[in-house]
Swiss-Prot record:
Top class in the EC scheme: transferase
CDD domains assigned: AdoMet_MTases
SUPFAM superfamilies: S-adenosyl-L-methionine-dependent methyltransferases (SSF53335)
A GO cellular component entry from the record: cytoplasm
Subcellular localization(s) per the UniProt record: Cytoplasm
PANTHER family linked to this entry: RIBOSOMAL RNA SMALL SUBUNIT METHYLTRANSFERASE C (PTHR47816:SF4)
Entries under InterPro entries matching the protein: DNA_methylase_N6_adenine_CS, Mtase_sm_N, rRNA_ssu_MeTfrase_C, RsmC/RlmG, SAM-dependent_MTases_sf, Small_mtfrase_dom
Protein name: Ribosomal RNA small subunit methyltransferase C
Organism, as annotated: Salmonella arizonae (strain ATCC BAA-731 / CDC346-86 / RSK2980)
Origin superkingdom: Bacteria
NCBIfam families: PRK09489.1
GN (gene name): rsmC
Length: 342
């Protein structure tokens, strides 16, 4: 992260106002402004592992990655700067959590792109920190209020679930396809045959639906699941547990924390990071899969048909097959052979 996002550029227009502030940055932290902002003290909390990776290099222990913020994350902060995400339930979850810990009278700033729905912050916080719009630029809004009443926060009400083929899928705000199985994952699931064996890695596991479905008809598989999202990691753990399935689940920026090689890697890779379109994760997934597949191991991914993954697959593995498709999605399969670029 080097270039600032439009939301951060709006904040920088008011940088003089924060020189004496002790700030907690939270929400959709798409750049390293929390590490570079001139203020009395700066801390950050994020649910995104890749954001933590970047910020921790500069902020050390003053940034923390976890599902929920705790009192230690607030420390003696008197100001919250919250970057609004594109997902309103995610914002509700994060803000209620953080505001339950902030001191009464704390300055609350909410900033975000208009297209993300940042305007709804006013209604969401009306009972706790009534907001006023203090700036509008770069197609973003900046809102300010003071914390008048701390909300009560409990994680339990934010859990949700849905069923698919006899499996219970546990979800949380911010998890991909929180309200039900998405069409792409459904297509990928249709290609997974029963009695699969060996070590399987599910990258970008979301709520764990792919792994749970695979394990339900292939009990001999050994599952490893990873995601950048703390809610996804916790949801996947809960999905496996409630269905009596075993697997190793942890946070990882694609392969950053993955050790060893696998017989199959499956993924429905994201092509957005917050509001921004980004193919970085998918490109890293494909190009680096060769370092995590056994000889003869298989990479199987689903993607929107318009995305340029066939070219990357061919450049990396030498070939690819389309094993299922609809008008919108394709499932790509390739195999680790000697011609793959290691």
């Amino acid at each position: 992260m080097s270039a600032f996002t439009p939301a951060s550029e709006v904040l920088l227009r008011h940088s003089d106002d924060f020189e004496q502030s002790r700030i907690l940055f939270a929400g959709d932290l798409q750049d390293d402004l929390p590490a570079r902002f001139e203020c009395a003290a700066s801390r950050a909390h994020t649910q995104q592992f890749h954001h933590w990776q970047v910020l921790s290099r500069q902020m050390g222990d003053n940034v923390r990655f976890s599902l929920v913020a705790q009192a230690c994350d607030i420390a003696d902060c008197d100001t919250l700067i919250y970057y609004w995400p594109k997902n309103k339930p995610e914002a509700q979850f994060q803000l209620m959590n953080i505001l339950s810990l902030m001191p009464s009278g704390a300055d609350i700033f909410v900033v975000g792109e208009n297209r993300s729905g940042v305007r709804s912050a006013e209604q969401m916080l009306a009972d706790y920190a009534p907001l006023n719009k203090v700036d509008s630029a770069r197609r973003c809004g900046l809102y300010h209020g003071r914390l008048e009443k701390q909300p009560l926060f409990s994680l339990e009400p934010y859990w949700d679930e849905y069923s698919i083929d006899g499996l219970i899928i546990k979800t949380l705000p911010g998890v991909f396809s929180r309200d039900g199985l998405d069409v792409g994952s459904q297509l990928l699931l249709s290609t997974l045959t029963p009695h699969t064996k060996g070590k399987v890695l599910d990258v970008g596991c979301g709520a764990g639906v792919l792994s749970a479905a695979l394990a339900s008809h292939s009990p001999k598989v050994r599952l490893t699941l990873c995601d950048v999202s703390a809610p996804a990691v916790e949801a996947s753990r809960a999905t496996l547990a409630v269905n009596g399935l075993d697997g190793d689940v942890f946070a990882s920026n694609v392969f950053s924390e993955v050790k060893g090689r696998f017989d199959m890697i499956i993924s429905n890779p994201p092509f957005h990071d917050g509001m921004q379109t980004s193919l970085d994760a998918a490109q890293t997934l494909i190009r680096s899969a060769v370092r995590h597949l056994n000889s003869g191991g298989e990479l199987r991914i689903v993607a929107n048909a318009f995305l340029p993954y066939p070219k990357i697959l061919d450049e990396t593995f030498g070939f690819h097959d389309v094993i299922a498709q609809t008008g919108r999605f394709k499932v790509y399969r390739t195999v680790m052979t000697r011609q793959a670029k290691k």
